[in-house]
A protein has these predicted regions:
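Flavin (primarily FAD) cofactor-binding/catalytic cores of flavoenzymes
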Residues: 2-43, 47-49, 79-421
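Redox-cofactor-proximal catalytic regions of oxidoreductases
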Residues: 45-72, 97, 267
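A short acidic, helix-capping loop that chelates divalent metal ions and anchors anionic groups
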Residues: 74-78
Length: 421
């Protein structure tokens, strides 16, 4: 082993930090361009962030959405969804097939720009490279609200990152905070196990699993890839209203059980106690915002006001013969008590699962290239620092840039740029 401080450095033309789907796609294209490179992966095994999903997890992307270079789905079930362990196995097989040069168990600790290149210190030695690709992904630092520290120590707190199944929780009721895809799906997992669940509702939009004759992801994917051909640029990164929008919620859908949309009011009908936004604690009570009816209405209207309209515009512009949209259901159901205050002991809550998203982690990067959101300043993945690139971040170039459907396109552009230096 080489010491980062004292040992001789490994030298390579291009270093790729991360060997998840972004890193592997980049490796594929670098190989095609004949660029010598090395991938560094801090995990002990391949499989990326999919290894952090719960046991019952299924991809939200249908099989037809596998569009990595030299990895597309050609089987009999294009509209089906793969479970977690099959996804992990698929990426391990892919890495072997493309002969990706990966060093596992290698954590990057510091990176600096030196003499027109970069010095990268890791847990397994020092590297020098003329080019570096940041491909360590968007699921790095679990975010938990500051008010989490107010909860008593007897309450088990887990982020969705660490949740695996209901059996790892103590007996008693569970509070799930957040209704993005993780929050909705974990709530269903707990319900199926017969657990009592309280749910703090966020503003992530619901969506139908199928829309106008296709899986809803079909239209989202077409808008990403072909929308600009018809002047429909709403899912292109340069059309975002603000930098914060790069971290907006994805539609509330699931690939479990053959795929379905998750309707928050339906969860309430099934016995989930719905609450507004979690705001903190007060004298042994959990405190929530008192706007649950407005939140539910906002959640339900989100798809039709944005993605649904975009899909309709694409269908019309492309001249696609698609069935009309089903009328949006009007659902007036509300819980008898929205529960702005909830006593932990009276409710029997013994655990909290924070489904509150992730932050980016570039703490190793000792180069002034990050914006106020810890996001690299770039154009199409090419940062303002010569030789430094990014692939696999949300909204890098498009809405789906961080997904296995589009990350290969961004990786191809970046690899071509590296080859041309």
């Amino acid at each position: 082993m080489h010491s980062p401080e004292n040992g001789p450095a490994h030298v390579v033309d291009a270093l790729v930090i991360g060997a998840g789907q972004a890193g592997l796609a980049t490796s594929y294209w670098l190989t095609r361009h004949g660029v010598e490179h090395q991938l560094l992966e801090q995990r002990p095994e391949l499989g990326g962030a999919w290894q952090d999903r719960w046991d019952s997890f299924y991809l939200n992307t249908p099989n037809f959405g596998f569009l990595l270079p030299d990895l597309t789905y050609n089987g009999p079930e294009p509209d089906a969804f793969l479970p977690r362990d099959e996804v992990i196995g698929l990426f391990r097989d892919y890495a072997a097939r493309i002969k990706a040069p990966v060093r596992l168990g290698t954590e990057v600790t510091r990176m600096v720009a030196v003499d027109g290149g970069f010095t990268v210190d890791t847990s397994q030695g020092r590297w020098q490279a003329r080019n570096v690709v940041l491909a360590n992904g968007a699921f790095q630092v679990p975010r938990v609200p500051p008010a989490a520290v107010e909860l008593p120590g007897r309450i088990l707190q887990l982020h969705s990152h660490d949740y695996r199944n209901p059996q790892q929780l103590p007996g008693g009721a569970v509070l799930v905070v957040g209704t993005g895809q993780s929050g909705g799906q974990i709530t269903e997992d707990l319900l199926d196990a017969g657990r009592t669940v309280h749910l703090s509702v966020s503003t992530c939009p619901e969506a139908p699993r199928r829309y106008r004759g296709q899986d809803v992801f079909h239209w989202i994917l077409q808008l990403n890839l072909r929308g600009p051909e018809y002047g429909l640029n709403g899912l292109q990164a340069d059309q975002l209203p603000s930098p914060a929008a790069r971290f907006m919620c994805n539609p509330l859908i699931s690939g479990n059980g053959g795929g379905h949309g998750i309707h928050v009011r339906d969860l309430g009908r099934r016995g989930v106690r719905l609450h507004g936004r979690f705001e903190g604690t007060d004298d042994g009570d959990l405190v929530f915002s008192d706007d649950l009816p407005a939140r539910l209405a906002l959640v339900e209207a989100g798809f039709s006001q944005r993605l649904g309209r975009m899909a309709d515009a694409y269908i019309a512009a492309a001249g696609i013969d698609a069935p009309p949209a089903d009328p949006a259901p009007v659902d007036p159901w509300l819980p008898a008590d929205s529960g702005e205050r909830l006593n932990l002991d009276a409710a029997g809550i013994t655990s909290v699962i924070w489904c509150t998203g992730y932050g980016l982690d570039f703490g190793f990067l000792d180069i002034p290239v990050l914006d106020a959101w810890n996001y690299p300043r770039h154009s199409r993945g090419v940062t303002e620092v010569p030789g430094l690139y990014a692939v696999g971040l949300p909204w890098l170039t498009k809405h789906l840039s961080a997904t296995l459907s589009v990350v290969g396109d961004d990786a191809e552009f970046v690899a071509s740029h590296i080859a041309g230096r």
